[in-house]
Amino acid sequence: MHQLLENLSGNGMGLLIPLGLSWLIWTILLPKQQYRGKLFNDRARFEWFYTKARRRFLENGGVILNNAFKKSENSFYVMTSREVEIVLNPKYMNEVRNDDRFAVTERVDQLLHGDVPGFGIIKHSAQTHKIFSNTFQSRVVREIGTFLVPIFEEIDHFLETQWTDNEEWHAFSLHPSMVQLVSQESTRLFLGPEMCRDAHWLQASVKYIQSFFMGIDLLDSWRPIFRPLVSKFSKTGKQIRSDLAEARQILSPFIADRQARKAKGEKFNDLLQWFDDAARGAEYDAPLLILRSSMAAVHSTSDLLTKAIFEICTQPGLIDDIREEAIRVFKEHGLRQTAIQELRLTDSVLKETQRLKPLQTTAFIRLTKEDVVLSDGLEIPKGTPIRISNHHMWDPEVSEYPNADQFDGYRFYKLRQVPGQEQTAQLATVSPSHTGFGLGKHACPGRFFAATATKVILCKILLDYDLKLLDGQRPKTMWRGDAQVPDPMCQIVVRRRKEEFNLSSLLHDVK
Protein backbone atom coordinates (compact mmCIF):
# COMPACT_ATOMS: atom_id res chain seq x y z
CA MET A 1 0.00 0.00 0.00
CA HIS A 2 2.84 2.40 0.85
CA GLN A 3 4.17 1.95 -2.69
CA LEU A 4 0.97 3.40 -4.13
CA LEU A 5 1.00 6.31 -1.67
CA GLU A 6 4.48 7.19 -2.84
CA ASN A 7 3.44 6.91 -6.49
CA LEU A 8 0.15 8.79 -6.44
CA SER A 9 0.30 12.40 -7.52
CA GLY A 10 -2.05 15.06 -6.18
CA ASN A 11 -4.88 14.54 -8.66
CA GLY A 12 -4.96 10.84 -7.85
CA MET A 13 -5.44 11.12 -4.11
CA GLY A 14 -9.22 11.08 -4.52
CA LEU A 15 -8.94 7.44 -5.56
CA LEU A 16 -7.24 6.47 -2.34
CA ILE A 17 -10.35 5.25 -0.49
CA PRO A 18 -11.80 2.99 -3.24
CA LEU A 19 -8.37 1.69 -4.11
CA GLY A 20 -7.64 1.08 -0.46
CA LEU A 21 -10.84 -0.94 -0.07
CA SER A 22 -10.01 -2.96 -3.16
CA TRP A 23 -6.56 -3.62 -1.77
CA LEU A 24 -8.07 -5.00 1.45
CA ILE A 25 -10.37 -7.31 -0.53
CA TRP A 26 -7.50 -8.42 -2.76
CA THR A 27 -5.10 -9.15 0.07
CA ILE A 28 -7.56 -10.85 2.44
CA LEU A 29 -10.33 -12.53 0.48
CA LEU A 30 -9.25 -13.24 -3.08
CA PRO A 31 -6.37 -15.67 -2.42
CA LYS A 32 -8.77 -18.10 -0.76
CA GLN A 33 -10.90 -18.10 -3.92
CA GLN A 34 -7.99 -18.89 -6.21
CA TYR A 35 -6.72 -22.27 -5.15
CA ARG A 36 -7.69 -25.64 -3.79
CA GLY A 37 -5.10 -26.92 -1.39
CA LYS A 38 -2.42 -25.74 0.98
CA LEU A 39 -0.50 -22.60 0.15
CA PHE A 40 3.22 -23.24 0.68
CA ASN A 41 4.25 -19.69 1.55
CA ASP A 42 1.11 -18.60 3.37
CA ARG A 43 0.88 -15.57 5.62
CA ALA A 44 3.15 -15.75 8.64
CA ARG A 45 1.78 -15.71 12.15
CA PHE A 46 0.06 -12.43 13.04
CA GLU A 47 -0.01 -11.34 9.38
CA TRP A 48 -3.54 -10.35 8.35
CA PHE A 49 -2.71 -9.58 4.75
CA TYR A 50 -0.79 -11.25 1.91
CA THR A 51 1.27 -8.15 1.18
CA LYS A 52 4.36 -9.42 2.98
CA ALA A 53 4.02 -12.90 1.44
CA ARG A 54 4.05 -11.32 -2.01
CA ARG A 55 7.01 -9.16 -1.08
CA ARG A 56 8.94 -12.15 0.24
CA PHE A 57 8.41 -13.96 -3.06
CA LEU A 58 9.49 -10.92 -5.07
CA GLU A 59 12.70 -10.66 -3.06
CA ASN A 60 13.49 -14.37 -2.67
CA GLY A 61 11.29 -16.38 -5.02
CA GLY A 62 13.93 -18.85 -6.15
CA VAL A 63 14.74 -19.93 -2.61
CA ILE A 64 11.03 -20.30 -1.78
CA LEU A 65 10.46 -22.55 -4.80
CA ASN A 66 13.52 -24.65 -3.99
CA ASN A 67 12.34 -25.19 -0.41
CA ALA A 68 8.84 -26.04 -1.60
CA PHE A 69 10.04 -28.86 -3.86
CA LYS A 70 11.91 -30.39 -0.94
CA LYS A 71 8.57 -30.81 0.83
CA SER A 72 6.19 -31.39 -2.09
CA GLU A 73 7.67 -33.40 -4.94
CA ASN A 74 5.02 -33.09 -7.65
CA SER A 75 3.24 -29.76 -7.24
CA PHE A 76 2.30 -27.04 -4.79
CA TYR A 77 0.46 -23.75 -4.62
CA VAL A 78 2.56 -20.66 -4.03
CA MET A 79 1.80 -17.00 -3.50
CA THR A 80 3.90 -15.20 -6.09
CA SER A 81 4.45 -11.46 -6.14
CA ARG A 82 1.15 -11.26 -8.02
CA GLU A 83 -1.25 -14.07 -7.11
CA VAL A 84 -1.61 -17.73 -6.23
CA GLU A 85 -0.20 -20.13 -8.84
CA ILE A 86 0.45 -23.85 -9.02
CA VAL A 87 4.06 -24.87 -9.68
CA LEU A 88 4.62 -28.27 -11.29
CA ASN A 89 7.51 -30.69 -11.25
CA PRO A 90 9.63 -30.72 -14.46
CA LYS A 91 8.41 -34.27 -15.16
CA TYR A 92 5.18 -32.74 -16.51
CA MET A 93 6.95 -30.77 -19.26
CA ASN A 94 6.35 -33.16 -22.13
CA GLU A 95 2.72 -33.53 -21.12
CA VAL A 96 2.04 -29.80 -20.92
CA ARG A 97 4.28 -28.20 -23.55
CA ASN A 98 2.01 -28.56 -26.60
CA ASP A 99 -1.33 -29.11 -24.82
CA ASP A 100 -3.75 -26.44 -26.06
CA ARG A 101 -5.79 -26.68 -22.86
CA PHE A 102 -3.02 -24.59 -21.34
CA ALA A 103 -3.11 -21.06 -22.79
CA VAL A 104 0.21 -19.30 -23.36
CA THR A 105 -0.67 -15.99 -25.00
CA GLU A 106 -3.47 -15.19 -22.58
CA ARG A 107 -1.22 -15.85 -19.59
CA VAL A 108 1.65 -13.74 -20.93
CA ASP A 109 -0.82 -10.91 -21.57
CA GLN A 110 -1.96 -11.18 -17.95
CA LEU A 111 1.55 -11.23 -16.50
CA LEU A 112 2.68 -8.25 -18.57
CA HIS A 113 -0.58 -6.31 -18.12
CA GLY A 114 -1.22 -6.11 -21.84
CA ASP A 115 -4.61 -4.38 -21.41
CA VAL A 116 -3.15 -1.48 -19.40
CA PRO A 117 -2.14 1.63 -21.42
CA GLY A 118 1.63 1.72 -21.86
CA PHE A 119 2.08 -2.04 -21.46
CA GLY A 120 0.64 -3.18 -24.78
CA ILE A 121 3.86 -4.09 -26.61
CA ILE A 122 3.19 -7.77 -25.89
CA LYS A 123 -0.56 -7.86 -26.54
CA HIS A 124 -1.19 -7.96 -30.29
CA SER A 125 -3.80 -9.18 -32.70
CA ALA A 126 -3.38 -12.74 -33.94
CA GLN A 127 -2.17 -11.34 -37.28
CA THR A 128 0.50 -9.15 -35.68
CA HIS A 129 1.67 -11.95 -33.40
CA LYS A 130 2.02 -14.18 -36.46
CA ILE A 131 4.12 -11.53 -38.19
CA PHE A 132 6.44 -11.37 -35.18
CA SER A 133 6.87 -15.10 -34.57
CA ASN A 134 7.18 -16.10 -38.23
CA THR A 135 9.80 -13.43 -38.89
CA PHE A 136 12.02 -14.54 -36.01
CA GLN A 137 11.53 -18.27 -36.61
CA SER A 138 12.34 -18.15 -40.32
CA ARG A 139 13.68 -14.89 -41.75
CA VAL A 140 15.99 -13.96 -38.88
CA VAL A 141 17.43 -17.47 -38.76
CA ARG A 142 18.01 -17.39 -42.51
CA GLU A 143 19.55 -13.91 -42.62
CA ILE A 144 21.62 -13.77 -39.43
CA GLY A 145 24.79 -14.99 -41.15
CA THR A 146 24.74 -11.99 -43.49
CA PHE A 147 24.66 -9.63 -40.51
CA LEU A 148 27.78 -10.83 -38.74
CA VAL A 149 29.94 -8.01 -40.10
CA PRO A 150 27.48 -5.18 -39.30
CA ILE A 151 26.85 -6.60 -35.82
CA PHE A 152 30.57 -6.97 -35.21
CA GLU A 153 31.14 -3.36 -36.29
CA GLU A 154 28.74 -2.19 -33.59
CA ILE A 155 30.36 -4.38 -30.94
CA ASP A 156 33.78 -3.04 -31.96
CA HIS A 157 32.55 0.56 -31.91
CA PHE A 158 30.92 0.18 -28.49
CA LEU A 159 33.95 -1.40 -26.84
CA GLU A 160 36.32 1.15 -28.34
CA THR A 161 34.24 4.11 -27.16
CA GLN A 162 32.92 2.77 -23.83
CA TRP A 163 35.51 0.28 -22.56
CA THR A 164 38.27 2.28 -24.33
CA ASP A 165 41.84 1.32 -25.25
CA ASN A 166 43.09 2.14 -21.76
CA GLU A 167 45.83 -0.35 -20.87
CA GLU A 168 45.49 0.46 -17.16
CA TRP A 169 42.97 -1.40 -15.02
CA HIS A 170 39.67 0.51 -14.78
CA ALA A 171 36.37 -0.50 -13.18
CA PHE A 172 32.69 -0.16 -14.11
CA SER A 173 29.38 -1.92 -13.46
CA LEU A 174 29.07 -4.81 -15.91
CA HIS A 175 25.32 -5.31 -16.35
CA PRO A 176 24.44 -1.73 -17.40
CA SER A 177 27.29 -1.88 -19.89
CA MET A 178 25.97 -5.14 -21.36
CA VAL A 179 22.49 -3.63 -21.66
CA GLN A 180 23.90 -0.73 -23.68
CA LEU A 181 26.06 -2.98 -25.85
CA VAL A 182 23.25 -5.40 -26.70
CA SER A 183 20.92 -2.50 -27.42
CA GLN A 184 23.36 -1.04 -29.96
CA GLU A 185 24.26 -4.26 -31.76
CA SER A 186 20.66 -5.53 -31.91
CA THR A 187 19.42 -2.19 -33.26
CA ARG A 188 21.78 -2.68 -36.22
CA LEU A 189 19.80 -5.78 -37.16
CA PHE A 190 16.42 -4.30 -36.27
CA LEU A 191 16.59 -0.82 -37.83
CA GLY A 192 19.78 -0.60 -39.87
CA PRO A 193 22.85 1.67 -39.69
CA GLU A 194 20.97 4.94 -39.25
CA MET A 195 19.58 4.15 -35.80
CA CYS A 196 22.08 1.81 -34.12
CA ARG A 197 24.28 4.71 -32.95
CA ASP A 198 21.47 7.18 -32.40
CA ALA A 199 21.95 8.08 -28.73
CA HIS A 200 18.39 9.39 -28.42
CA TRP A 201 16.85 6.13 -29.62
CA LEU A 202 19.19 3.87 -27.65
CA GLN A 203 18.50 5.79 -24.46
CA ALA A 204 14.74 5.92 -25.06
CA SER A 205 14.36 2.22 -25.81
CA VAL A 206 16.36 1.13 -22.75
CA LYS A 207 14.54 3.64 -20.54
CA TYR A 208 11.17 2.25 -21.64
CA ILE A 209 12.27 -1.32 -20.92
CA GLN A 210 13.38 -0.37 -17.42
CA SER A 211 10.21 1.56 -16.58
CA PHE A 212 8.11 -1.27 -18.05
CA PHE A 213 9.42 -3.78 -15.52
CA MET A 214 9.09 -1.28 -12.68
CA GLY A 215 5.46 -0.86 -13.68
CA ILE A 216 4.85 -4.60 -13.60
CA ASP A 217 6.00 -4.74 -9.98
CA LEU A 218 3.67 -1.86 -9.11
CA LEU A 219 0.56 -3.31 -10.79
CA ASP A 220 1.02 -6.89 -9.64
CA SER A 221 -0.45 -6.10 -6.20
CA TRP A 222 -3.75 -4.86 -7.61
CA ARG A 223 -6.82 -6.56 -9.03
CA PRO A 224 -7.07 -6.25 -12.83
CA ILE A 225 -10.08 -3.93 -12.68
CA PHE A 226 -8.08 -1.33 -10.74
CA ARG A 227 -4.76 -1.57 -12.58
CA PRO A 228 -5.63 0.98 -15.29
CA LEU A 229 -6.47 3.50 -12.55
CA VAL A 230 -3.31 2.78 -10.59
CA SER A 231 -1.28 3.11 -13.76
CA LYS A 232 -3.04 6.31 -14.81
CA PHE A 233 -2.46 8.19 -11.56
CA SER A 234 0.88 6.80 -10.39
CA LYS A 235 4.26 8.33 -11.16
CA THR A 236 5.49 5.00 -12.49
CA GLY A 237 2.51 4.63 -14.83
CA LYS A 238 2.95 8.14 -16.14
CA GLN A 239 6.65 7.47 -16.70
CA ILE A 240 5.88 4.34 -18.73
CA ARG A 241 3.45 6.16 -21.00
CA SER A 242 5.87 9.05 -21.38
CA ASP A 243 8.73 6.70 -22.28
CA LEU A 244 6.53 4.85 -24.78
CA ALA A 245 5.43 8.12 -26.37
CA GLU A 246 9.06 9.23 -26.64
CA ALA A 247 10.03 5.97 -28.35
CA ARG A 248 7.15 6.35 -30.79
CA GLN A 249 8.11 9.95 -31.53
CA ILE A 250 11.55 8.75 -32.56
CA LEU A 251 10.41 5.74 -34.58
CA SER A 252 7.37 7.18 -36.37
CA PRO A 253 9.19 9.74 -38.55
CA PHE A 254 11.97 7.24 -39.19
CA ILE A 255 9.45 4.67 -40.44
CA ALA A 256 7.59 7.30 -42.50
CA ASP A 257 10.85 8.33 -44.16
CA ARG A 258 11.64 4.67 -44.78
CA GLN A 259 8.30 4.17 -46.55
CA ALA A 260 8.87 7.25 -48.72
CA ARG A 261 12.30 6.01 -49.76
CA LYS A 262 10.90 2.56 -50.53
CA ALA A 263 8.30 4.17 -52.76
CA LYS A 264 11.18 5.60 -54.80
CA GLY A 265 12.72 2.16 -55.24
CA GLU A 266 15.26 2.07 -52.41
CA LYS A 267 15.82 -1.39 -50.89
CA PHE A 268 16.33 -2.25 -47.24
CA ASN A 269 17.39 -5.37 -45.41
CA ASP A 270 16.68 -5.41 -41.68
CA LEU A 271 14.05 -6.58 -39.20
CA LEU A 272 11.72 -3.68 -39.93
CA GLN A 273 11.72 -4.62 -43.61
CA TRP A 274 11.21 -8.28 -42.80
CA PHE A 275 8.16 -7.40 -40.70
CA ASP A 276 6.79 -5.53 -43.72
CA ASP A 277 7.48 -8.52 -45.95
CA ALA A 278 5.69 -10.87 -43.55
CA ALA A 279 2.71 -8.51 -43.24
CA ARG A 280 2.12 -8.62 -47.01
CA GLY A 281 0.33 -5.29 -47.00
CA ALA A 282 -1.69 -5.87 -43.83
CA GLU A 283 -1.70 -3.10 -41.24
CA TYR A 284 0.31 -3.62 -38.06
CA ASP A 285 1.95 -1.50 -35.37
CA ALA A 286 5.60 -1.43 -36.47
CA PRO A 287 6.91 0.67 -33.53
CA LEU A 288 5.40 -1.73 -31.01
CA LEU A 289 6.91 -4.77 -32.74
CA ILE A 290 10.33 -3.10 -32.79
CA LEU A 291 10.04 -2.29 -29.08
CA ARG A 292 8.94 -5.84 -28.35
CA SER A 293 11.96 -7.15 -30.26
CA SER A 294 14.27 -4.78 -28.43
CA MET A 295 12.88 -5.77 -25.05
CA ALA A 296 13.32 -9.48 -25.74
CA ALA A 297 16.85 -9.07 -27.07
CA VAL A 298 18.17 -6.65 -24.48
CA HIS A 299 16.58 -8.30 -21.45
CA SER A 300 17.65 -11.87 -22.18
CA THR A 301 20.99 -11.40 -23.97
CA SER A 302 22.43 -8.89 -21.49
CA ASP A 303 21.40 -11.21 -18.65
CA LEU A 304 23.19 -14.21 -20.18
CA LEU A 305 26.35 -12.28 -21.07
CA THR A 306 26.63 -10.68 -17.64
CA LYS A 307 26.26 -13.99 -15.82
CA ALA A 308 28.73 -15.73 -18.15
CA ILE A 309 31.40 -13.05 -17.68
CA PHE A 310 30.95 -13.12 -13.91
CA GLU A 311 31.51 -16.90 -13.99
CA ILE A 312 34.60 -16.99 -16.22
CA CYS A 313 36.27 -14.04 -14.46
CA THR A 314 37.32 -16.51 -11.77
CA GLN A 315 38.66 -19.07 -14.27
CA PRO A 316 41.69 -17.71 -16.18
CA GLY A 317 42.41 -21.12 -17.70
CA LEU A 318 38.95 -21.20 -19.26
CA ILE A 319 39.42 -17.69 -20.62
CA ASP A 320 42.69 -18.75 -22.27
CA ASP A 321 40.98 -21.74 -23.90
CA ILE A 322 38.15 -19.58 -25.25
CA ARG A 323 40.72 -17.19 -26.72
CA GLU A 324 42.61 -20.03 -28.37
CA GLU A 325 39.42 -21.38 -29.90
CA ALA A 326 38.36 -17.95 -31.17
CA ILE A 327 41.74 -17.30 -32.80
CA ARG A 328 41.80 -20.69 -34.50
CA VAL A 329 38.19 -20.54 -35.71
CA PHE A 330 38.16 -16.97 -36.98
CA LYS A 331 41.52 -17.37 -38.71
CA GLU A 332 40.14 -20.35 -40.59
CA HIS A 333 36.59 -19.20 -41.32
CA GLY A 334 36.60 -15.41 -41.00
CA LEU A 335 33.47 -13.53 -39.91
CA ARG A 336 31.06 -16.06 -41.38
CA GLN A 337 28.31 -18.25 -40.00
CA THR A 338 30.54 -21.32 -40.26
CA ALA A 339 32.82 -19.70 -37.69
CA ILE A 340 29.94 -19.20 -35.25
CA GLN A 341 29.03 -22.86 -35.57
CA GLU A 342 32.61 -23.89 -34.77
CA LEU A 343 32.86 -21.85 -31.55
CA ARG A 344 32.03 -24.94 -29.52
CA LEU A 345 33.69 -24.06 -26.24
CA THR A 346 32.26 -20.54 -26.30
CA ASP A 347 28.85 -22.05 -27.01
CA SER A 348 29.34 -24.49 -24.12
CA VAL A 349 30.22 -21.75 -21.63
CA LEU A 350 27.08 -19.82 -22.50
CA LYS A 351 24.83 -22.88 -22.41
CA GLU A 352 26.30 -23.91 -19.05
CA THR A 353 25.69 -20.42 -17.68
CA GLN A 354 22.09 -20.59 -18.83
CA ARG A 355 21.70 -24.07 -17.31
CA LEU A 356 22.93 -23.04 -13.88
CA LYS A 357 21.52 -19.50 -13.83
CA PRO A 358 18.68 -19.21 -16.36
CA LEU A 359 16.75 -16.01 -16.89
CA GLN A 360 13.89 -17.57 -14.90
CA THR A 361 13.86 -20.59 -12.60
CA THR A 362 10.44 -21.59 -13.94
CA ALA A 363 9.14 -22.02 -17.47
CA PHE A 364 5.93 -23.01 -19.26
CA ILE A 365 3.90 -20.06 -18.03
CA ARG A 366 0.31 -21.10 -18.75
CA LEU A 367 -3.36 -20.59 -17.81
CA THR A 368 -5.74 -23.55 -17.78
CA LYS A 369 -8.68 -22.97 -20.13
CA GLU A 370 -10.65 -25.89 -18.65
CA ASP A 371 -10.42 -28.41 -15.85
CA VAL A 372 -7.41 -30.63 -16.56
CA VAL A 373 -6.50 -34.04 -15.17
CA LEU A 374 -2.91 -35.06 -15.91
CA SER A 375 -1.83 -38.63 -16.60
CA ASP A 376 -1.02 -39.37 -12.95
CA GLY A 377 -4.35 -38.02 -11.73
CA LEU A 378 -3.20 -34.53 -10.72
CA GLU A 379 -6.18 -32.19 -11.05
CA ILE A 380 -5.76 -28.57 -12.14
CA PRO A 381 -8.93 -26.44 -12.03
CA LYS A 382 -9.99 -24.18 -14.88
CA GLY A 383 -8.52 -20.69 -14.64
CA THR A 384 -5.47 -21.77 -12.64
CA PRO A 385 -2.18 -20.06 -13.49
CA ILE A 386 0.61 -22.64 -13.72
CA ARG A 387 4.34 -22.72 -14.23
CA ILE A 388 6.85 -25.59 -14.35
CA SER A 389 10.10 -25.52 -12.44
CA ASN A 390 13.48 -25.61 -14.18
CA HIS A 391 15.28 -27.06 -11.16
CA HIS A 392 15.96 -30.31 -13.04
CA MET A 393 18.77 -28.40 -14.75
CA TRP A 394 20.82 -27.67 -11.60
CA ASP A 395 19.49 -29.74 -8.69
CA PRO A 396 21.97 -32.64 -8.23
CA GLU A 397 19.24 -34.82 -6.71
CA VAL A 398 17.12 -34.83 -9.88
CA SER A 399 19.35 -33.58 -12.72
CA GLU A 400 20.83 -35.87 -15.35
CA TYR A 401 23.97 -33.71 -15.39
CA PRO A 402 26.87 -34.84 -13.15
CA ASN A 403 27.74 -32.32 -10.42
CA ALA A 404 24.76 -30.32 -11.60
CA ASP A 405 25.14 -27.62 -8.97
CA GLN A 406 28.68 -26.78 -10.16
CA PHE A 407 29.69 -24.60 -13.11
CA ASP A 408 31.63 -26.53 -15.76
CA GLY A 409 32.31 -24.46 -18.85
CA TYR A 410 33.48 -27.56 -20.74
CA ARG A 411 30.34 -29.60 -19.99
CA PHE A 412 28.52 -29.18 -23.30
CA TYR A 413 31.75 -29.01 -25.29
CA LYS A 414 32.42 -32.57 -24.13
CA LEU A 415 28.80 -33.66 -24.63
CA ARG A 416 28.94 -32.61 -28.29
CA GLN A 417 31.67 -35.21 -28.78
CA VAL A 418 29.31 -37.97 -27.62
CA PRO A 419 27.48 -39.72 -30.50
CA GLY A 420 23.91 -38.45 -30.66
CA GLN A 421 24.65 -35.31 -28.63
CA GLU A 422 26.17 -33.18 -31.40
CA GLN A 423 22.99 -31.19 -31.97
CA THR A 424 21.23 -31.34 -28.59
CA ALA A 425 24.22 -29.89 -26.71
CA GLN A 426 24.21 -26.62 -28.68
CA LEU A 427 23.13 -23.35 -27.04
CA ALA A 428 20.19 -22.68 -29.37
CA THR A 429 18.87 -26.25 -29.13
CA VAL A 430 16.05 -26.91 -26.67
CA SER A 431 15.49 -30.27 -24.98
CA PRO A 432 13.66 -31.64 -21.91
CA SER A 433 16.94 -31.66 -19.99
CA HIS A 434 17.83 -28.03 -20.82
CA THR A 435 14.91 -25.60 -20.99
CA GLY A 436 16.73 -22.28 -20.79
CA PHE A 437 15.03 -21.20 -24.03
CA GLY A 438 11.82 -23.11 -23.32
CA LEU A 439 10.59 -26.23 -25.09
CA GLY A 440 8.18 -27.22 -27.82
CA LYS A 441 6.32 -24.95 -30.20
CA HIS A 442 6.47 -22.03 -27.76
CA ALA A 443 10.27 -22.06 -27.37
CA CYS A 444 11.97 -18.66 -27.70
CA PRO A 445 11.82 -17.72 -31.42
CA GLY A 446 14.80 -15.36 -31.12
CA ARG A 447 17.22 -17.87 -29.61
CA PHE A 448 19.28 -18.31 -32.79
CA PHE A 449 19.97 -14.59 -33.00
CA ALA A 450 20.73 -14.49 -29.27
CA ALA A 451 23.16 -17.40 -29.55
CA THR A 452 25.02 -15.80 -32.45
CA ALA A 453 25.25 -12.37 -30.83
CA THR A 454 26.40 -13.62 -27.43
CA LYS A 455 29.18 -15.74 -28.93
CA VAL A 456 30.55 -12.89 -31.05
CA ILE A 457 30.38 -10.44 -28.13
CA LEU A 458 32.07 -12.80 -25.67
CA CYS A 459 34.90 -13.66 -28.06
CA LYS A 460 35.54 -10.02 -28.95
CA ILE A 461 35.65 -9.00 -25.28
CA LEU A 462 38.03 -11.78 -24.26
CA LEU A 463 40.39 -11.23 -27.19
CA ASP A 464 40.60 -7.48 -26.58
CA TYR A 465 40.53 -7.23 -22.78
CA ASP A 466 41.87 -8.71 -19.59
CA LEU A 467 39.16 -8.76 -16.96
CA LYS A 468 38.60 -9.68 -13.34
CA LEU A 469 36.11 -9.09 -10.54
CA LEU A 470 36.64 -5.96 -8.47
CA ASP A 471 38.55 -7.01 -5.33
CA GLY A 472 37.78 -10.62 -6.27
CA GLN A 473 34.23 -10.24 -4.94
CA ARG A 474 31.70 -12.55 -6.59
CA PRO A 475 28.32 -10.89 -7.26
CA LYS A 476 25.65 -11.50 -4.67
CA THR A 477 22.56 -13.50 -5.58
CA MET A 478 19.60 -11.24 -6.31
CA TRP A 479 16.03 -12.32 -6.96
CA ARG A 480 13.11 -10.69 -8.71
CA GLY A 481 10.44 -13.28 -8.10
CA ASP A 482 11.60 -16.49 -9.74
CA ALA A 483 14.25 -14.66 -11.80
CA GLN A 484 17.86 -14.66 -10.62
CA VAL A 485 19.02 -11.28 -11.86
CA PRO A 486 22.58 -9.92 -12.17
CA ASP A 487 23.65 -7.47 -9.50
CA PRO A 488 23.50 -4.14 -11.39
CA MET A 489 26.09 -2.61 -9.06
CA CYS A 490 28.67 -5.40 -9.29
CA GLN A 491 31.80 -4.13 -11.01
CA ILE A 492 34.48 -5.77 -13.09
CA VAL A 493 37.95 -4.40 -13.75
CA VAL A 494 39.28 -4.43 -17.32
CA ARG A 495 42.28 -3.30 -19.31
CA ARG A 496 43.03 -3.33 -23.01
CA ARG A 497 45.34 -6.18 -23.94
CA LYS A 498 47.54 -6.71 -26.97
CA GLU A 499 45.44 -9.29 -28.72
CA GLU A 500 47.12 -12.22 -30.46
CA PHE A 501 44.70 -11.85 -33.35
CA ASN A 502 42.81 -8.70 -34.32
CA LEU A 503 39.26 -9.66 -35.23
CA SER A 504 38.69 -6.21 -36.70
CA SER A 505 41.15 -7.04 -39.48
CA LEU A 506 38.63 -9.56 -40.80
CA LEU A 507 36.23 -6.76 -41.71
CA HIS A 508 38.35 -5.84 -44.70
CA ASP A 509 38.57 -9.46 -45.84
CA VAL A 510 34.78 -9.91 -45.79
CA LYS A 511 34.06 -6.57 -47.42
Swiss-Prot record:
Pathway: Secondary metabolite biosynthesis; terpenoid biosynthesis
Binding site for heme: C444
Pfam families: p450 (PF00067)
GO biological process: mycotoxin biosynthetic process; terpenoid biosynthetic process
GO cellular component: membrane
InterPro entries named among the record's database cross-references: Cyt_P450, Cyt_P450_CS, Cyt_P450_E_grp-IV, Cyt_P450_sf
Topology versus the membrane: Single-pass membrane protein
Cofactor(s) annotated in UniProt: heme
The organism's place on the tree of life at top rank: Eukaryota
Record localization: Membrane
EC number: 1.-.-.-
Glycosylated residues in this chain: N7, N502
Keyword annotations of the record: Glycoprotein, Heme, Iron, Membrane, Metal-binding, Monooxygenase, Oxidoreductase, Transmembrane, Transmembrane helix
Entry's Gene Ontology molecular function annotations: heme binding; iron ion binding; monooxygenase activity; oxidoreductase activity, acting on paired donors, with incorporation or reduction of molecular oxygen
Coiled-coil positions: none
Transmembrane portions of the chain: 10-30
Function: Cytochrome P450 monooxygenase; part of the gene cluster that mediates the biosynthesis of paraherquonin, a meroterpenoid with a unique, highly congested hexacyclic molecular architecture. The first step of the pathway is the synthesis of 3,5-dimethylorsellinic acid (DMOA) by the polyketide synthase prhL.
Family label: Belongs to the cytochrome P450 family.
Name under which the protein is recorded: Cytochrome P450 monooxygenase prhD
Species name: Penicillium brasilianum
Gene: prhD
